């Protein structure tokens, strides 16, 4: 049976695989993406916004690994599709378990430009749908309280809250690879301080509010999406 070009392209775009991997953190100065300059925090107090590259290695912690940057499909002779990069904007729609966070992120038009830029490298620390649903308040309801506000103010504050929630879960940096032999500290776009380390053969990301386990890594040509079982920020309840 001879497959059509459309069918073959679809196959090449949606290949999934499970690998055992090692996370190699990347330290270095913060990128200066002009659309995001208002959100970037300067490097200070020894903290660097870390980026963590993924490499196949049987000695590493166990997580699901989906490599969209290199589908690895061998096509029949004469049926080769046009090759091209797969960016984070595509990776975000590949996994339904992060659809809520992906929806929040897609509302940030300036950040989306970066995620669709092949010259920038970004790590998205995406809370799963279950993690978002478990929060005592919805992401658009904190940190700025919207109760008792006018409809206009509610909309403005909700948008600010969503932008803050997203910025707390995005890390940008240059690709300077180091070895993963100590706890690595980093800052998100919002300036949130996080630590990344391994424990009991798992990759963990710790903030002041939570310690989250990385359950899957989706690798693309311009970054990676880490699917996490907890949000890095949680609402403060009276």
UniProtKB/Swiss-Prot annotation:
SMART domains (alphabetical): FAS1 (SM00554)
Predominant location category: other
One term under GO cellular component: vacuole
Cellular compartments annotated: Vacuole
InterPro entries: FAS1_dom_sf, FAS1_domain, Mug57-like
Keywords in alphabetical order: Signal, Vacuole
A Pfam family reported for this protein in Swiss-Prot or TrEMBL: Fasciclin
UniProt domain FAS1: residue ranges: 85-232
Signal peptide boundaries: 1-17
The protein, known as: FAS1 domain-containing protein YALI0D26906g
Annotated organism of origin: Yarrowia lipolytica (strain CLIB 122 / E 150) (Yeast)
């Amino acid at each position: 049976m001879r497959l059509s070009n459309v069918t073959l392209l679809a196959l090449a775009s949606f290949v999934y695989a499970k690998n055992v991997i090692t996370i190699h953190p990347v330290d270095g100065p913060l990128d200066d993406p002009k659309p995001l300059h208002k959100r970037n925090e300067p490097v200070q107090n020894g903290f660097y916004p870390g980026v963590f590259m993924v490499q196949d290695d049987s000695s590493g912690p166990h997580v699901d690994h989906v490599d969209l940057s290199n589908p690895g499909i061998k096509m029949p002779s004469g049926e080769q599709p046009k090759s091209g990069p797969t960016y984070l904007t595509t990776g975000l729609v590949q996994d339904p378990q992060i659809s809520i966070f992906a929806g929040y992120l897609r509302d940030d038009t300036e950040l989306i430009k970066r995620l669709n830029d092949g010259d920038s490298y970004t790590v998205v620390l995406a809370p799963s749908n279950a993690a978002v649903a478990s929060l005592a308040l919805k992401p658009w309801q904190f940190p700025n309280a919207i109760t008792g506000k006018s409809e206009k103010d509610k909309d403005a504050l909700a948008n600010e809250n969503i932008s803050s929630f997203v910025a707390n879960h995005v890390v940008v940096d240059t690709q300077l690879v180091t070895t993963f032999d100590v706890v690595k500290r980093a800052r998100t776009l919002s300036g949130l301080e996080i630590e990344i380390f391994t424990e009991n053969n798992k990759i963990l990301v710790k903030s002041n509010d939570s310690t989250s386990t990385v359950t899957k890594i989706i690798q693309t040509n311009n970054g990676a999406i880490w699917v996490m079982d907890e949000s890095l920020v949680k609402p403060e309840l009276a």
